[in-house]
Amino acid sequence: MSTSLQYSTAMTSSALASSDGLWCVLLAAGESRRLGYPKQLVRDPIKPLMLRAIDAAQAVTPADQLLVVLGAYNLRLRPLLARNCSGMRIVNNAHWQDGIASSLRAGVDALPRQARGVLIVLTDQPYVNAFSLGRLTAAWRRHPSRAVAARYPNGPGVPAILPRRLLHSLRELQGDMGAKTILDKAGSNTLLVDMPEAAFDVDTSEDLSLLTYGSS
């Protein structure tokens, strides 16, 4: 992949839009079985991937509207979050071995009743940044009753935003069924945002060897 990993402290225009009811669920509960060690802790030249994902999420949603779902490495990751982050809420998914659906349920169950939508973010998409998520949130804020998702060759995928009317569907997922299942069912009602940077994720050591970094 030719895109370089870039850094920026710029905030999107929606960063302080805390009254619109958009919350973020960041999934960081997996075991990283294929990689062999926690991908959440994979370090680029500046910080672990999990902290980069949190930075991106906090650029578009207030810290107190961010839920980080931990699981396999709950005890190992909590100190890192305590040292580097504030304001967000940590949710422990004790059933992380049941698959990603269990983490989605844990996150949705922790949302307050006033949440109008949920932004779903992963920790293993290193090229997804604040500007990527800013495009999603801008589209959702124009159409808050619709799902908004990254465009993949095979249809919609994460990162994605689901409106409140679809949150019950997340609770019904099982095993390794993710948000894509719901987005596919929503069909043409899902708004797609071009996001080629989302296509790269870190699952194996080979993926790490392809990861490149920018200097800005």
Labelled PLM ranges:
Residues 2-20, 168-216:
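Conserved alpha/beta core of the MobA/IspD/sugar-nucleotide pyrophosphorylase nucleotidyltransferase superfamily
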Residues 16-123, 127-156, 188-195:
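Nucleotide and nucleotide-moiety/phosphate-recognizing core
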Residues 32, 42, 167-168, 209:
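Nucleotide phosphate-binding site architecture
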Residues 127, 161, 201-202:
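Short aromatic/basic micro-patch
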Residues 147-149, 159-161, 182:
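Conserved hydrophobic/aromatic beta-strand scaffold that supports enzyme active sites
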Residues 156-157, 162, 178, 197:
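A conserved catalytic-core signature of glycosyltransferases
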Residues 157-168, 205:
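Conserved nucleotide-sugar donor-binding
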